């Protein structure tokens, strides 16, 4: 499902990733753990095609991210470290925006209902995002990552800034998502 081979990233003369290789199979959950500056976000940005590597390859469901970026990204749902939410939108408006941006072809109403159920946000569907807790905002970010039924989810720091109860909720959500998706998260 995910193949990372000999991944290298240099920023000038500083090497931040040094020949990293790993596989994540269908239905597995992989956590990238490490101190700030360890290269977790850099690895995820390369895996999502948002940053080029100095060397090595990334394949998502058989598609090399640099050679076949459109096909690879169709397999992918991504939650960046700072979810790109629009605080003045309602959850409904934001998810509709994300659905259109991703050019999703699944039946809109049913698909968005499924995404909201999966991310446990149905109870805030009509609320304005800026009025919601950080935990809900993270779940909204996860919901947008689920749009289009991607096989692979990459979640960068999904529990960052959350209180212990919210952290547990997000970790439980990731565990449930791992039953249908291959998941990589950083912490």
Where do the protein language model's features map onto the residues?
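Catalytic Walker B motif of ABC-type/P-loop ATPase nucleotide-binding domains
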Residues: 153-157
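Conserved ABC transporter NBD signature motif
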Residues: 56-67, 71-72
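A short, proline-enriched helix->beta-strand linker immediately N-terminal to the Walker B motif
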Residues: 147-151, 180
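Helical segment within the ABC ATPase nucleotide-binding domain
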Residues: 167-179
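Hydrophobic anchor residue at the start of the ABC signature
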Residues: 142
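Conserved ABC ATPase "signature" region
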Residues: 96, 100-103, 107-124
């Amino acid at each position: 499902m995910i193949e990372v081979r000999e991944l290298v990233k240099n920023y000038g003369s500083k090497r931040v990733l040094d020949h990293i290789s790993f596989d994540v199979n269908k239905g597995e959950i992989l956590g990238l753990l490490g101190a700030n500056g360890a290269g977790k976000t850099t690895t995820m940005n390369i895996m999502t095609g948002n940053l080029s590597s100095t060397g090595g390859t990334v394949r998502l469901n058989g598609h090399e991210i640099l050679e076949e970026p459109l096909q690879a990204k169709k397999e992918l749902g991504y939650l960046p470290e700072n979810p790109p939410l629009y605080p003045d939108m309602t959850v409904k408006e934001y998810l509709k925006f994300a659905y259109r941006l991703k050019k999703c072809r699944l039946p809109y109403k049913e698909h968005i209902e499924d995404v909201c159920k999966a991310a446990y946000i149905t109870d805030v569907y009509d609320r304005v995002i800026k009025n919601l807790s950080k935990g809900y905002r993270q779940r909204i970010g996860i919901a947008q990552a689920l749009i289009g039924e991607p096989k692979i989810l990459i979640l960068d720091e999904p529990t960052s800034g959350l209180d212990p109860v919210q952290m547990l909720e997000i970790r439980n959500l990731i565990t449930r998502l791992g039953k249908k998706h291959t998941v990589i998260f950083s912490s």
